[in-house]
Swiss-Prot record:
Coiled-coil positions: none
GO terms assigned for molecular function: DNA binding
Main location: cytoplasm
Top-level lineage group: Bacteria
UniProt keyword Transcription regulation present: yes
Protein name: Probable transcriptional regulatory protein WP1214
Length: 246
């Protein structure tokens, strides 16, 4: 029976992994569809779509699914209409969280997000309740490999960005710029350095809260994970960092 039990556990994990992969694909397709509907269907002329396709390819989303999503958006094929909504709240330890969602039913999504917050030791607040703790900026991220930081930094100065910094731990270069300058800066960096790992408008914390208590780290991690596991949630941003010693 031990062998049977082990096989069952493997099957269960495989099933969970497949479900996560399917959910990830659904979110990627949703982002591609929304990006294509909001702008041109040529990725070279629609940076948001180009970025969505780049992310989809990194996750090995089949090419035919990418093409179908774009064609459906271009042809206005009857289907669900999605809107972008931002939710704000606090988690354990007082950490501020901003939840970004694409939904076809705002009442359902708000109810589900509120339930996750309350069940995991947090509180969903009103719009603006925590966003004042962040700066709204354009965010562009490159992998450090193959790119000279000095070249990137000097180009950032030329484009008058807000900041260019190295994240040595993650081996990334992080560029921030004003929201109004985002399109210009993103396209300029793309032309000179190629497709970034990430390019989007982002809420960057003015100050970071360091969470060092093991129990709070676990609770906050679970809250963020459950939020990101929600079908309508694209990603979550926060103003906290976990202590390195843990």
């Amino acid at each position: 029976m031990a062998g049977h039990s082990q096989f069952s556990n493997i099957k269960h994990r495989k099933g969970a992994q497949d479900a996560k992969r399917s959910q990830k694909f659904t979110k990627l397709i949703r982002e591609i569809t929304v990006a294509a509907k909001q702008g041109l269907t040529d990725p070279e002329l629609n940076p948001r779509l180009r970025s969505a396709i780049f992310s989809a390819r990194k996750e090995n989303l089949p090419k035919d699914k990418i093409e179908t999503a774009i064609k459906n958006a271009a042809g206005n094929v009857a289907g669900e209409s999605y809107e972008e909504i931002q939710y704000e709240g606090c988690g354990p330890s007082g950490a501020a969280l901003i939840v970004h969602a694409l939904t076809n039913n705002r009442n359902r999504t708000a109810s589900e997000i509120r339930y996750i917050f309350s069940r995991k030791g947090g509180n969903l607040g009103e719009t603006g309740c925590v966003s004042y703790l962040f700066d709204h900026v354009g965010l562009i991220v490159y992998k450090a490999e193959g790119i000279n930081f000095e070249d990137l930094f000097n180009y950032g100065i030329e484009l008058e960005v807000l900041n260019v910094e190295e994240n040595n731990k993650e081996e990334l270069y992080v560029i921030t710029c004003g929201v109004k300058d985002f399109g210009r800066v993103r396209d300029a960096f793309y032309t000179k350095f190629g497709e970034p790992e990430l390019a989007r408008l982002s809420w960057q914390p003015k100050d970071l809260i360091e969470v060092s208590d093991k129990e709070l780290i676990d609770k906050l991690s679970i809250l963020v994970e459950e939020l990101e596991d929600n079908d309508d949630v694209q990603y979550v941003e926060g103003n906290f960092i976990f202590a390195d010693k843990l």
